[in-house]
């Protein structure tokens, strides 16, 4: 028997005995083809096996890209609805040059052919087999070929790990807008991203029906996917030239919500110490739910998928066997039956006693975070995007709509249907221009502010205040620039997600129609993020960007035409949501509350509605205080 045959036999036996899996010929090279991998700058030895990426030139600089690296076994069949299982090491060289699958989700097709919508839809094959990650490395970093050997070539650099948004129901790391080649080319950082399970595939929670310690439907599987990917990247950072102790998470919307959980959860605290949260924190109303609510949604899904929900108490495994036999498309469609209205997603992080042992703000308020730094922020018009989609009969994408006062009230009642009449009336009073009550265009602006403040800006402010109080070093930005070539109607302003293309450097792509000031803004944001990942501060000492505290809520303005420092943002509106409304809610159950409610309702039904907001809110304050006596 020849030496090559003996070698192949030996490797095969080792693979079977040690639990190694042989990838297909399509994804790996044969043993004889990788004997000289140490001389190949595009081959890296990871803890899972060898990977080969590809090289591209970006803005005159070379970037090495690795896409589609598996970090977990495919969560299919018996692994559906369970925590991710680490990938078995492979033999050969993995071809890391192809974009991975996107996790199962539904496409948004409200405006067919509209690029502003299509840019957020998955651009690769949709599959349950989706747990892969991507890495971008500046070529000037000498890639080493083993994760455990120290480098003698140059200092290791920070690693930025992107977590995409999409309300925990949609999104994919493969979107063009998330291509991190420009960040890698212009900043001395490595960038990575991962896929994680969405919707019921990532958040179904029915664990109470199984014995303690069971791995069945534990909830938050999508977050566990993220954790496994972060740990893989941390374990292999040095092999790519990165510093495993300088890892910063950054993400938008649900990505920001996820990051805030990883920073303070008892499971992941200490895994990373820096996070950048764009338009999303874990305390936002759309970013978490109770275990009881998650169970209720899970039962509805079981029934809608044709499985026997009555068996859950005594034969839960039979129920899950049935659910694992349901095709993915059916689950993906039926889960939306529990959508509860604007930003009322049926799958979110769940308070399940492990990753989220209690209410997010209780977790934050009870912790000590003096060794952590966070950078977070909001956009100027966070609410208009969601307002358009959920009330599409009321608004036009391309131009302003005259919102009748009656429809304004209808939208308030719909969004806040679970609040008392008194609370809803208070919202109307706070968000009314009393000098122009019947100006439909102002009503449209006000309702957009309601959505943006309640769901995004004010939860972000609240998180920042409490985090600072518990020792975190907090930096806040406010993105106020409307892109010169925005595809959305001008009335929508600076919408949710508008900052993402600047974060990833797309204005520096000269084939796109950005102006020179927007290119400068993008470069400034990338530099701020890279400096934050390196030093814990987003700017150099000669730039004024003060820390954010409750007493001094100062933020840095990101705008192509002006920069500066502001306070808030939206300080008055957020005082209403974060301070006043909870007090009103606490006292609305008293015997006198109906009197207040009746009085306010009479004012509300008045044809004039001319009480100024200061007067009306003072009346509510007085009556609330009287009720508390």
Swiss-Prot record:
SS bond partners: 103-130, 307-322, 458-574
Catalytic activity annotation: acetylcholine + H2O = choline + acetate + H(+)
PTM section of the record: The N-terminus is blocked.
SUPFAM superfamilies: alpha/beta-Hydrolases
GO biological process, one term: choline metabolic process
Signal sequence residues: 1-38
Propeptide position ranges: 606-629
MF terms in GO: acetylcholinesterase activity
Protein name listed in UniProt: Acetylcholinesterase
Organism: Leptinotarsa decemlineata (Colorado potato beetle)
């Amino acid at each position: 028997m020849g030496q090559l045959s003996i070698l192949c036999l030996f490797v095969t036996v080792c693979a079977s005995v040690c639990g190694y899996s042989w990838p297909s010929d399509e994804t790996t090279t044969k043993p004889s083809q990788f004997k000289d991998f140490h001389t190949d700058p595009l081959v890296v030895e990871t803890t899972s096996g060898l990977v080969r990426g590809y090289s591209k030139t970006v803005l005159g600089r070379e970037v090495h890209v690795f896409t589609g690296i598996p970090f977990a076994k495919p969560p299919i069949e018996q692994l559906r609805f369970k925590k991710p299982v680490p990938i078995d090491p492979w033999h050969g060289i993995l071809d890391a040059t192809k974009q991975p699958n996107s996790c199962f989700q539904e496409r948004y097709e409200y405006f067919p052919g509209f690029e502003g919508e299509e840019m957020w839809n998955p651009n690769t094959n949709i599959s349950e087999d989706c747990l892969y990650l991507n890495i971008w490395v500046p070529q000037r970093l000498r890639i080493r070929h083993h994760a455990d050997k120290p480098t003698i070539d140059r200092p290791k650099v920070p690693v930025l790990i992107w977590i995409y948004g999409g309300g925990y129901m949609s999104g994919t790391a493969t979107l063009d807008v998330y291509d991190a080649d420009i960040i890698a080319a212009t900043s001395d950082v490595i960038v990575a991203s991962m896929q994680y399970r969405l919707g019921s595939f990532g958040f179904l929670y029915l664990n109470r029906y199984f014995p303690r310690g069971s791995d069945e439907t534990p909830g938050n599987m999508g977050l566990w996917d993220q954790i496994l990917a972060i740990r893989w990247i941390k374990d292999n950072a040095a092999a790519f030239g990165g510093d495993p102790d300088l890892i910063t998470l950054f993400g938008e919307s649900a990505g920001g919500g996820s990051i805030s959980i990883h920073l303070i959860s008892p499971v992941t605290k200490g895994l990373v110490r820096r996070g950048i949260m764009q338009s999303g924190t874990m305390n936002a109303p759309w970013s978490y739910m109770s275990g009881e609510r998650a169970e209720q949604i899970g039962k509805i899904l079981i029934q809608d998928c044709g499985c026997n929900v009555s068996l859950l108490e005594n034969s839960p495994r039979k129920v899950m066997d049935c659910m694992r036999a349901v095709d993915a498309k059916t689950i993906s469609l039926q889960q939306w039956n529990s959508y509860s209205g604007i930003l009322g997603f049926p799958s979110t992080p769940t308070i399940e006693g492990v990753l989220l042992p209690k209410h997010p703000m209780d977790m934050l308020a009870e912790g000590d975070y003096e060794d952590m730094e966070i950078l977070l922020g909001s956009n100027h018009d966070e609410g208009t995007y969601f307002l358009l989609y959920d009330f599409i009969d009321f608004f036009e994408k391309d131009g302003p709509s005259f919102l009748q006062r009656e429809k304004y009230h209808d939208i308030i009642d719909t969004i806040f249907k679970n609040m008392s009449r008194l609370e809803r009336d208070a919202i109307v009073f706070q968000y009314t221009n009393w000098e122009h009550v019947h100006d439909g265009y102002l009503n449209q602006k006000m309702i957009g502010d309601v959505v943006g403040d309640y769901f995004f800006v004010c939860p972000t402010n609240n998180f920042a205040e409490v985090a600072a109080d518990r020792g975190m070093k907090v930096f806040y930005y406010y993105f106020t620039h409307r892109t010169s070539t925005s595809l959305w109607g001008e009335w929508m302003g600076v919408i949710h997600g508008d900052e993402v293309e600047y974060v990833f450097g797309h204005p520096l792509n000269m084939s796109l129609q950005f102006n020179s000031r927007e290119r400068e803004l993008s470069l400034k944001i990338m530099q701020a993020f890279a400096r934050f990942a390196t030093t814990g501060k987003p700017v150099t000492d000669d730039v004024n960007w003060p820390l954010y505290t409750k007493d001094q809520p100062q933020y840095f303005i990101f705008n192509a035409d002006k920069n500066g420092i502001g306070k808030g943002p939206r300080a008055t509106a957020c005082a209403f949501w974060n301070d006043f409304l909870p007090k009103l809610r606490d006292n609305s159950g008293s015997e006198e509350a109906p009197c207040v409610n009746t009085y306010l309702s009479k004012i509300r039904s008045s044809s004039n509605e001319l009480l100024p907001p200061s007067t009306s809110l003072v009346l509510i304050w007085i009556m609330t205080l009287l009720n508390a006596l």
